[in-house]
From Swiss-Prot:
Biological process annotations from GO: cellular response to retinoic acid; embryonic heart tube morphogenesis; embryonic organ development; hippo signaling; lateral mesoderm development; neural tube closure; notochord development; paraxial mesoderm development
One GO CC term on file: chromatin
Name of the gene encoding the protein in the UniProt record: TEAD2
Quaternary data: Interacts with YAP1 and WWTR1/TAZ.
Designated name of the protein: Transcriptional enhancer factor TEF-4
Organism: Homo sapiens (Human)
Length: 447
């Protein structure tokens, strides 16, 4: 257990220390427009603007008519407004949301023509046309969205989606095929059998050096580094009469037990965009990133599944822990190094720390690697009450408005050397999928 941080008020008995400075909750925001000023070279999309536009498309997935509240401004933004805002921040040049919308439509029409020209047979063309007719322009220019809609339609499917990924990144799920064997070999020449005067037989050629070992397949495609990898993370509730973990309800969940070597590399997000969502004081995200190492910083966007158990009214007074059930968090890490890990989890509201929990875990050697398990760590009462109050809100957009100002910062260090091994920033929305909790992992960078 770590020492209580500045402003700590009490320890609730589960290892969480609290602070009053960040306990405010609420929603906010009025309708806002992104970039309505006079455009810079209106209608011209220079390379820097196009680059920022493509980056914004990756950061902000299609969200229909739903809007997002940015805590630093308290305004609600649609996707096109966020893209226009991103372009302004990155390039200093203004593009209105209407210009962004027009540009998306132009690209969608172009992509539609190109995709149909790539398909060889009429059946595939007809199916693609029918599917694309049901999609918005925003979905049409998103390769993953289109692939999910169309699915593999024939022998041309692989080529099709490599083409659709365009120049914004590497093709999706393309294996790294080497043109030559990587196996080292030895080439030697047998000297001729001759007694010619002055003849010196040639020396055997030295073997070629072995190839440099490749980094693990997950390293650029999952949450982890060469020194420490996250294997699993979950926040859950178990009913009082649960007999095994299958009866859990998972609010959020990450599983990296079997990382796919064919998965695309992680997308990047500028860490400066989320500085204000975390404490500015000692131990905040800005200071941690300044110290580095930069490759150990990640952002996880969770779409949390809040569809569980009884309603808030049935859960008991304030939805507290005494209302029944066990609320917990489990995580597992792996490493090739023998260490003792310290894991700090800070819950933040409006960019200020509310509570913090510090845990320590020793290594267990399993199958030639060191495993670190922090299992069934009790969730603090603040979080349990927060979940129940959040669930009582009548509309999903209200829940998302509250979650816009709610974040968690998790820092894993080597206890003995104080080296930072992993730093993960978590942000949240409410899941709309019947498949439950979902997530997306990004790498935090600073250009």
């Amino acid at each position: 257990m770590g020492e209580p941080r500045a402003g700590a008020a009490l320890d609730d008995g589960s290892g969480w220390t609290g602070s009053e400075e960040g306990s405010e909750e609420g929603t906010g925001g009025s309708e806002g427009a992104g970039g309505d000023g006079g455009p810079d070279a209106e209608g011209v999309w220079s390379p820097d603007i196009e680059q920022s536009f493509q980056e914004a498309l990756a950061i902000y997935p299609p969200c229909g008519r739903r809007k997002i509240i940015l805590s630093d401004e308290g305004k609600m933004y649609g996707r096109n407004e966020l893209i226009a805002r991103y372009i302004k921040l990155r390039t200093g040049k203004t593009r209105t949301r209407k210009q962004v919308s027009s540009h998306i439509q132009v690209l969608a029409r172009r992509k539609s023509r190109e995709i149909q020209s790539k398909l060889k047979d009429q059946v595939s063309k007809d199916k693609a046309f029918q599917t694309m007719a049901t999609m918005s322009s925003a979905q049409l220019i998103s390769a993953p969205s289109l692939q999910a809609k169309l699915g593999p339609t024939g022998p041309q499917a692989s080529e099709l989606f490599q083409f659709w990924s365009g120049g914004s990144g590497p093709p999706w799920n393309v294996p790294d095929v080497k043109p030559f064997s990587q196996t080292p070999f030895t080439l030697s020449l047998t000297p001729p059998s001759t007694d010619l005067p002055g003849y010196e037989p040639p020396q055997a050629l030295s073997p070629l050096p072995p190839p440099t070992p490749s980094p693990p397949a997950w390293q650029a495609r999952g949450l982890g580094t060469a020194r420490l990898q996250l294997v699993e993370f979950s926040a859950f509730v178990e009913p009082p009469d649960a007999v095994d973990s299958y009866q859990r309800h998972l609010f959020v969940h990450i599983s990296q037990h079997c990382p796919s070597p064919g998965a695309p590399p992680l997308e990047s997000v500028d860490v400066r965009q989320i500085y204000d969502k975390f404490p500015e004081k000692k131990g905040g995200l800005r200071e941690l990133y300044d110290r580095g190492p930069p490759h150990a910083f990640f952002l996880v966007k969770f779409w949390a599944d809040l569809n569980w158990g009884p309603s808030g009214e049935e859960a008991g007074a304030g939805g507290s822990i005494s209302s029944g059930g066990f609320y917990g968090v489990s995580s597992q890490y792996e490493s090739l190094e023998h260490m003792t890990l310290t894991c700090s989890s800070k819950v933040c509201s409006f960019g200020k720390q509310v509570v913090e929990k510090v845990e320590t875990e020793r290594a267990q050697l399993e199958d030639g690697r060191f495993v670190y398990r922090l299992l069934r760590s009790p969730m603090c009462e603040y979080l349990v009450n927060f979940l129940h109050k959040l669930r009582q809100l009548p509309e999903r957009y209200m829940m998302n408005s509250v979650l816009e100002n709610f974040t968690i910062l998790q820092v894993v260090t080597n206890r003995d050397t104080q080296e930072l091994l992993l730093c993960t920033a978590y942000v949240f929305e409410v899941s709309t999928s019947e498949r439950g909790a979902q997530h997306h992992i990004y790498r935090l960078v600073r250009d």
